[in-house]
Amino acid sequence: MDRTATASWEVMSRRGEQQQQLMMQAPASHNGGSGGGEPARSRWAPKPEQILILESIFNSGMVNPAKDETARIRRLLERFGAVRDANVFYWFQNRRSRSRRRARQLQQACGAALHQLPSAAAAAGAGGGGGYYHHHHQPSSSPFLMHGGGGGGVVTSTTAAPAVAASGHFLADEVDGGGDDDLFAISRQMGLMARHGGGDHHYGSYADSDATQLSYQPTGTIQVFINGVAYDVPSGGALDMAGTFGRDAMLVHSSGEVLPVDEHGVLINSLQMGECYYLVSKSI
């Protein structure tokens, strides 16, 4: 009897050890083997300053950055919060998908409008008399077209900026309504907000609807790109950042370098012709 009990206990012990080993190996096989699969990609919620930079880069034409460009963009975004190369890659991938979907929607809307033109023309002709059509051009505004108080210079736009880049509400109409492929919670309101107080700086915005004014470049100015939009800035001397954009704003070069200013809020170095800069807020 003792030998039988001992044998039964040994069999049960071995079975328990085998079950324990199987339980320990189950997570490894579930994740793709003993080597361990890649961790699940977590949802990244970029900050407003990071979205502003990403949208500016995308609107400037860089819609599919290479690996080295992705790393450079990631280093620029890290100034405002934690981010990985994978986050940047998937942001651009998702952004391209939304742009293509938006383009298809616009194409369908234009096609429907073209089909309605013949009937509209026939209705106008039936009304009698020569029809008169007046197109009122609504000038687009740019959130970064600002007038400085006191001795601050004036920064003016030299191109008819796209509605996406010129609107203070970046891509509010292109953000998905919570779909599965919308990886990021895109903010619907972007841009720096003017602060009120002792040193008020008004953020004004305007754009001349006259086409001749769009091609005019004042003497003594250079053209730079701020947030993907071309602007004329004074070529001589440094730009008064505090007087033009407010003390809460700073300029970041496309290389990731923050442009230094003195105690009066004036750039120590002048802006360079044709260079790309990003206007962001110091407060995160």
From Swiss-Prot:
UniProt cross-references to InterPro entries, sorted A to Z: HD (IPR001356), Homeodomain-like_sf (IPR009057), WOX11-like (IPR044558)
Subcellular location, record wording: Nucleus
Disulfide bonds listed in the record: none
DNA-binding region of this protein: 39-103
Pfam families: Homeodomain
Keyword field contains S-adenosyl-L-methionine: no
UniProt KW keywords: Developmental protein, DNA-binding, Homeobox, Nucleus, Transcription, Transcription regulation
Span list, region Disordered: 1-43
GO biological process: adventitious root development
GO cellular component terms attached to this protein's record: nucleus
Primary location recorded for the protein, binned into one broad class: nucleus
KW Nucleus (keyword) present: yes
Gene Ontology molecular function terms on file: DNA binding; DNA-binding transcription factor activity
Chain's role: Transcription factor which may be involved in developmental processes.
PANTHER family: WUSCHEL-RELATED HOMEOBOX 10, WUSCHEL-RELATED HOMEOBOX 11
Family: Belongs to the WUS homeobox family.
UniProt-recorded name of the protein: WUSCHEL-related homeobox 10
Origin organism lineage: Eukaryota, Viridiplantae, Streptophyta, Embryophyta, Tracheophyta
